[in-house]
């Protein structure tokens, strides 16, 4: 395993660990989730550049689009919860059920 792959894997693992530790606050969870997506994006971009195939080069861009959509939905939910309840605790999500 090259040092680049090891660093990217370590970044993903640290983000996953942060997600498990700070799971009670939505903002911290969103930041950790974004760190996981960025490390996956970099890993996919490195793998695509090593593959030398033009069909694989579109995969990191697609992953980046999904990460942006996920961040937008998460931030919209965060704003909605913080405006309604004044807190960003994840246990407030159960109060949003219809």
From Swiss-Prot:
<keyword id="KW-1133">Transmembrane helix</keyword>
<comment type="similarity">
    <text>Belongs to the complex I subunit 4L family.</text>
</comment>
<dbReference type="GO" id="GO:0042773">
    <property type="term" value="P:ATP synthesis coupled electron transport"/>
</dbReference>
<dbReference type="Pfam" id="PF00420">
    <property type="entry name" value="Oxidored_q2"/>
</dbReference>
<comment type="function">
    <text>Core subunit of the mitochondrial membrane respiratory chain NADH dehydrogenase (Complex I) which catalyzes electron transfer from NADH through the respiratory chain, using ubiquinone as an electron acceptor. Part of the enzyme membrane arm which is embedded in the lipid bilayer and involved in proton translocation.</text>
</comment>
<dbReference type="InterPro" id="IPR039428">
    <property type="entry name" value="NUOK/Mnh_C1-like"/>
</dbReference>
<feature type="transmembrane region" description="Helical">
    <location>
        <begin position="61"/>
        <end position="81"/>
    </location>
</feature>
<keyword id="KW-0520">NAD</keyword>
<dbReference type="InterPro" id="IPR001133">
    <property type="entry name" value="NADH_UbQ_OxRdtase_chain4L/K"/>
</dbReference>
<dbReference type="GO" id="GO:0005743">
    <property type="term" value="C:mitochondrial inner membrane"/>
</dbReference>
<dbReference type="GO" id="GO:0008137">
    <property type="term" value="F:NADH dehydrogenase (ubiquinone) activity"/>
</dbReference>
<protein>
    <recommendedName>
        <fullName>NADH-ubiquinone oxidoreductase chain 4L</fullName>
        <ecNumber>7.1.1.2</ecNumber>
    </recommendedName>
</protein>
<keyword id="KW-1278">Translocase</keyword>
<keyword id="KW-0812">Transmembrane</keyword>
<feature type="transmembrane region" description="Helical">
    <location>
        <begin position="1"/>
        <end position="21"/>
    </location>
</feature>
<feature type="transmembrane region" description="Helical">
    <location>
        <begin position="26"/>
        <end position="46"/>
    </location>
</feature>
<comment type="subunit">
    <text>Core subunit of respiratory chain NADH dehydrogenase (Complex I) which is composed of 45 different subunits.</text>
</comment>
<keyword id="KW-0999">Mitochondrion inner membrane</keyword>
<keyword id="KW-0472">Membrane</keyword>
<keyword id="KW-0679">Respiratory chain</keyword>
<keyword id="KW-0249">Electron transport</keyword>
<keyword id="KW-0496">Mitochondrion</keyword>
<keyword id="KW-0830">Ubiquinone</keyword>
<dbReference type="GO" id="GO:0045271">
    <property type="term" value="C:respiratory chain complex I"/>
</dbReference>
<keyword id="KW-0813">Transport</keyword>
